[in-house]
Amino acid sequence: MNAITTIKCPQCRKETTLAGNPYRPFCSQRCKMIDLGTWADEGYRIPGEKAPESGDEEPGDE
């Protein structure tokens, strides 16, 4: 049984295959680049404490 695995593109939600897809998990280069641009523009954020600004001392540095 050789079932073809399909997933939804995280950007446009279009169904796409994993096997042989050079842009996976995206359906196309366009969706991949849109996602990369969102990361570059800091549109996505990982939860946590804000990082210290450059020039600020680290906690414990005195």
Curated annotation (Swiss-Prot):
It holds the Pfam family YacG. Residues 43-53 have a biased composition (Basic and acidic residues). Its cofactor is Zn(2+). Zn(2+) binds at residues 9, 12, 27, 31. InterPro entries: DNA_gyrase_inhibitor_YacG (IPR005584), Znf_NHR/GATA (IPR013088). Residues 43-62 are annotated as: Disordered. The keyword Zinc applies. One of its GO terms (molecular function) is zinc ion binding. GO terms for biological process: regulation of DNA-templated transcription. Keywords: Metal-binding, Zinc. The keyword S-adenosyl-L-methionine does not apply. Binds 1 zinc ion. Disulfide bonds: none annotated. Interacts with GyrB. Belongs to the DNA gyrase inhibitor YacG family. Inhibits all the catalytic activities of DNA gyrase by preventing its interaction with DNA. Acts by binding directly to the C-terminal domain of GyrB, which probably disrupts DNA binding by the gyrase. This is DNA gyrase inhibitor YacG. It comes from Citrifermentans bemidjiense (strain ATCC BAA-1014 / DSM 16622 / JCM 12645 / Bem) (Geobacter bemidjiensis).
